Swiss-Prot record:
Key word Transferase present: yes
Membrane topology classification: Single-pass type II membrane protein
Residue intervals on the Cytoplasmic side: 1-43
Region of interest called Disordered, as start-end residue ranges on this chain: 1-25, 78-180
Name assigned to this protein: Beta-1,2-xylosyltransferease XAX1
Glycan attachment sites: 74, 104, 368, 429, 515, 549
Tissue: Highly expressed in young panicles.
Family affiliation: Belongs to the glycosyltransferase 61 family.
Keyword Lipid metabolism carried by entry: no
Organism: Oryza sativa subsp. japonica (Rice)
MF-aspect GO terms: UDP-xylosyltransferase activity
Subcellular location: Golgi apparatus membrane
Amino acid sequence: MTSTAYSRPSKLPGGGNGSDRRLPPRLMRGLTTKIEPKKLGVGLLAGCCLALLTYVSLAKLFAIYSPVFASTANTSALMQNSPPSSPETGPIPPQETAAGAGNNDSTVDPVDLPEDKSLVEAQPQEPGFPSAESQEPGLPAALSRKEDDAERAAAAAASEIKQSEKKNGVAAGGDTKIKCDENGVDEGFPYARPSVCELYGDVRVSPKQKTIYVVNPSGAGGFDENGEKRLRPYARKDDFLLPGVVEVTIKSVPSEAAAPKCTKQHAVPAVVFSVAGYTDNFFHDMTDAMIPLFLTTAHLKGEVQILITNYKPWWVQKYTPLLRKLSNYDVINFDEDAGVHCFPQGYLGLYRDRDLIISPHPTRNPRNYTMVDYNRFLRDALELRRDRPSVLGEEPGMRPRMLIISRAGTRKLLNLEEVAAAATELGFNVTVAEAGADVPAFAALVNSADVLLAVHGAGLTNQIFLPAEAVVVQIVPWGNMDWMATNFYGQPARDMQLRYVEYYVGEEETSLKHNYSRDHMVFKDPKALHAQGWQTLAATIMKQDVEVNLTRFRPILLQALDRLQQ
């Protein structure tokens, strides 16, 4: 009997000639007898399975990971293939963690996983996020086809730092960590690497005993046989000055019982430093105290307790606006306080760089602060309005403002009035002033200027208050002063995005010609005086006054005007 499933009419609907007819039923039966229905059904089933398998494979390859539809088992498997969290990268992002049992919150709590160094080094990318170069968006970093070279390098650098810390006596027992930079050398500026220690864990500060206790069961950290380390926390490594700095002891104790009891608990880090040395000089107030304090604590955003030794009430009063910007808490007098202050972290000493300069450095400046950042900090702390100089021609009759800083001691500009008159004649609105103890008031005056002019000396430090792109004119005294002029004020001005102009005084423009013959070393070989040290230099070259030749100096004023319009 012929199967009806495969039978067809012998003619097309509507009839037709013989050429339009289908194959006769007999021929169709001949074909169907060669293909059995059961075998055809098995073949179709196998084909469907193959197509389904291919679809599933391709879907797995191009699927986008979704924490909403991922099961707990899949999420656990994903975390096994991803690098664990570390203190540097923070906890695992929420999409890589499973919700805790009984947690009705819609968010997923982060989970800290034990650190596996082999995985961290092999997979330096952020866990759970695709590489920027990945060709498969949405896949976790552990499954990406390409690795991020920059993060691999960062992981390698972090590993090197950890190994270096182990070699240099960094203690890490439980929550305790002690890291000191005591033997750093800057060949050009040896004073630019003072001793600094960072302390983490149970840190107890006893000002009365001039001691910082650290609960350190391991005893590691480079301490002497008594478990002590002594520092003079002044931010200038100057052998002449350091004997006058209060010495503070860091004492490692094995347990809480061996440390004095806390009289006050603090939830923020402490920073202990000295304002001894040259800190009654504005240049040194900045280079040896305020800039190092900014470099050490700015990242804490006010959440730090300042303790000052060699305490000077007038100094604290003078810089109160800056200290309050760096710390939300009243300064503690380390010389008189009788309590025991307990902190989770502490700094003894301050990090610093060269004078009026902040450069990138892996330990001293890991956050890559610059002098531009410090200038911005000053403007915020002192509420200085201007961050750019005047635009010439913007308003009819507007004249650029020049501030000439006068000096009462040495290195006076003897013909200051003539210089001011020449500048006025060229179109400047000139103000002459001497820096005083009222820092906010004088900072506002400097900030209002477009051009600052001064003879080499501490007064030029006030360039830190100028708006960016203002002009600094330094009159450099006679006596091979180019190195000091460039490194103390010229390069810092450029780093602060100021426009710098300098004028070198000749033999006929210095008052030294009245005190020494032209055959004296002052004129014949001033470099030899520098080689004899600061005391000799201070007694000779630094005592001069200057009287500039207006014919020579006028082009400098024109250059300042031109630089202001660039």
